[in-house]
Amino acid sequence: MSDWSDLQKDKWINENREVEEVDAWDASSEDEVEKVEEEIKEPPKPVVKQLTKKQALQRAIELKEKELKEPQGDFDIYLEEKRKKELQEASDLENSKNLFSGLSVKESSSGEPISTFIPKTEKDFEQYSQIVSDYLLKYDSSIHYATFFKSLMKKVLVNVSSSDMNDISKTLTVLINEKLKNEKSGKGGNKTKTKVAPKKIHMGNELQNYDDFDDDDFM
C-alpha cells in the first residue's frame, strides 16, 4: 500500500512539473512576442525644436558670413551687384512713400484725404498738383532738392510718351528762360551783388610833405 501511495505521489509531482514547464514556456513565448513587437515598432521621430526670431536671425547672419567668405565667381559678383541695385531701388521707393505719406493729413475740396483722392479730370489734376507742390516746397531750401527732382522725374515719367515728354521739356525751357531773365534783371532769387573796389591809400603826398620838412624844424 505504501508503494502505491508513493507511486501516485510521484505521478502527481511529475504532472505538476509538466504543467509548470508548460506555463513557463507559454510565459517565455509571450515575452519573446512582446520583445519582437517592440523591436519592429517605428522609432519615435525626433522633435524639431522651433527657432526663435533671434536665433533664426543669428543663423541667417552666420550663413551669410559663410557665403561671403567663400570665393565668388563672375556670376556671383553679378548677382551681388544686382541684389544691391534692387535693395537701393526698394529703399528709394520706401523713401518716396514716406515723403508722400504726410499728404494724407491734408484734405481735398471734397473732404476726403489726399491719399485716397483719385484725380480724374483736368481740374482734379490741377488741384492735386497744387497740393503736392505746396508740400514739396517746404524742402526747397535743401541742397538735395534738385537731386531729388532729377530722381523723381526719372521715376514718374517712365510711362509717359515721348511726345508728352517733349511738351514737358518745352515747359521747362520756358521756365529756364524766365529764370535767366529775372536773374539778369536782378529780380531773381539770387541777386548779383556789385563788387565794391577797395579804397586806394594815397601815400605819395604824405611822403612828399614829410620830405619838405627840414631837420632844423625839429630843433
Curated annotation (Swiss-Prot):
Residue stretches spanning the membrane: none
Disulphide-bridged cysteine pairs: none
Protein's cellular compartments: Cytoplasm
Chain segments annotated as coiled-coil in the UniProt record: 48-100
UniProt-listed InterPro entries: eIF3-like_dom_sf (IPR023194), eIF3j (IPR013906)
Principal place of residence: cytoplasm
Keyword Iron: no
Gene Ontology MF annotations: translation initiation factor activity
Disordered as annotated region, ranges: 22-47
Keyword Cytoplasm among record annotations: yes
This protein's GO CC annotations: eukaryotic 43S preinitiation complex; eukaryotic 48S preinitiation complex; eukaryotic translation initiation factor 3 complex
Superkingdom, natural source: Eukaryota
Biased composition (Acidic residues): 22-40
Pfam families: eIF3_subunit
Protein keywords: Coiled coil, Cytoplasm, Initiation factor, Protein biosynthesis
Any Gene Ontology biological process: formation of cytoplasmic translation initiation complex
Function: Component of the eukaryotic translation initiation factor 3 (eIF-3) complex, which is involved in protein synthesis of a specialized repertoire of mRNAs and, together with other initiation factors, stimulates binding of mRNA and methionyl-tRNAi to the 40S ribosome. The eIF-3 complex specifically targets and initiates translation of a subset of mRNAs involved in cell proliferation.
Assembly and binders: Component of the eukaryotic translation initiation factor 3 (eIF-3) complex.
Family: Belongs to the eIF-3 subunit J family.
HAMAP family assigned: eIF3j (MF_03009)
PANTHER family in the cross-refs: EUKARYOTIC TRANSLATION INITIATION FACTOR 3 SUBUNIT J
Protein name in UniProt: Eukaryotic translation initiation factor 3 subunit J
Native source species: Dictyostelium discoideum
